[in-house]
Amino acid sequence: MLATVLTDKRPIIKVSINGHETAALVDTGASLSIVSESDMSKLKFKRGSKLAGTVIGLDGSEQSMYHTDKDFDFKVEGLPAYQFVIGNIDAIKSSIKKETGIEISAIIGYPTIKQLELIINPSTNEISIGYKD
């Protein structure tokens, strides 16, 4: 199965968060999968408990992250994806929108890439999904 890739400039795919269609960056270098804290009300999700410790962002700043609540629902081509945390990704969102015109709501990091068995083929601009529910 193929994910719907939205641009040839970055590996950005169509996803569903709590039934709302949006976009996510597939980032093989990200150790966490993060959903945008600033999109909580738009996508109708709440944050759960705070993660222990802090995470260092791309700019070197420390930030707190939160678990998603029990009702959080993230899907790629109808398949459920897990292991997301909530964090501030506004700087990344802004950079990507400036470059591609697409506003992302999440970053799919390595744990979720493994779970969905995503394979990125930059030659064909395709992202295949090996996981079957």
For the regions a language model picked out, list residue spans one by one.
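Pepsin/retropepsin-fold aspartyl endopeptidases
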Residues: 1-133
